[in-house]
Structure formats: C-alpha cells, structure tokens
Regions:
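Iron-associated oxidoreductase/ferritin-like identity signal
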Residues: 1-155
Length: 155
C-alpha cells in the first residue's frame, strides 16, 4: 500500500467511524450515552480533517479520491447486543491506529510523523473509552449475584 492509498483508507475509516457513532448516538434514548457517541463522532471528524490536511500537504496537486463504500459494513453484527457493537467499534479504532502508526513509520517529515503518532495515540484513547463503556454495561447487567441475596428475601 502506498502513502496515497494509506491516507485514503485512513480518511475512509474515519468517515465510516463517524457514521457508526452518529447512528449509535441516534439509537439510544439515554442522554449520557447519546452524548458519548456524539463526542466520539466529533473526534473522528477532527481526525478526518487532520488527515485530509496531511494528504493535501504531501500531495498538493492531487485531488483525493475516496473509493470505498462509506457506510459501515456491519453484516453479521448483532446490533441488539451493545457489547458486540462496542467491540466492533474498538476493532475500527484499532484499524485506524495501525494505519496511523504505519504512515508515521514511513514519514520523513518530523511534524507529519508527530501528528500521525498523536492520531494513533488518540485512537488508543478512543479504545479505552469504548472499553470503559463495555465495563459500564457489564456492571449494569451484572450488578448483583442472586446467590448473595439468599436469606434476605422471603420465599
């Protein structure tokens, strides 16, 4: 994969992630959860703009052509399973992180390399936020062990 393709793939991945988080933000009735996904969507939009800037800087006379389908491919994903959806989102963050690290490794310009490493680090932070959501969901689903209630409830 050449650098143009890597930038294009990274931008397409950011747009797909934005679309995923936008859909997730709309699908929850809980305001806190909606805000969480809306914020992630904004982070991904910021990444898209930064990567577009890097592309324009490196290839100033070449128009960026997005070729991938920009809707999130979620065949086989159980949308009714919040944990599965969050794990899918984590996999998308991991993909973006790998692309940024590969681009940084290939970059000769120090400022470009630094920005790409920063983007990779931010993707790691996004993963941590998503893992925290999984823990929160699991905590809500398993907030007590029924056996601990034996003796406290009348039969």
């Amino acid at each position: 994969m050449n650098r143009k393709d890597a930038y294009r793939i990274a931008i397409e991945a950011e747009i797909r992630s934005q679309n995923l988080y936008k859909a997730l933000a709309k699908s929850f009735k809980n305001e806190e959860t909606t805000q969480f996904y809306s914020q992630l969507m904004l982070y991904e939009k910021d990444h898209e703009m930064k990567v577009r800037g890097l592309y324009a800087q490196e290839f100033p006379h070449e128009k960026l052509k997005l070729v991938g389908k920009l809707d999130m491919q979620m065949e086989g994903l159980e949308l009714g399973d919040p944990k599965a959806v969050l794990e899918f989102a984590i996999s998308r963050e991991e993909l973006a992180q790998k692309i940024y690290l590969k681009l940084a490794e290939q970059s000769e310009d120090a400022s470009t390399k630094a920005l790409l490493k920063q983007l990779a680090a931010e993707e790691e932070q996004h993963k941590e936020l998503l893992y925290a959501e999984i823990e929160k969901i699991q905590g809500l689903l398993k907030w007590f062990d029924r056996s601990e209630l034996d003796g406290f409830m009348e039969h």
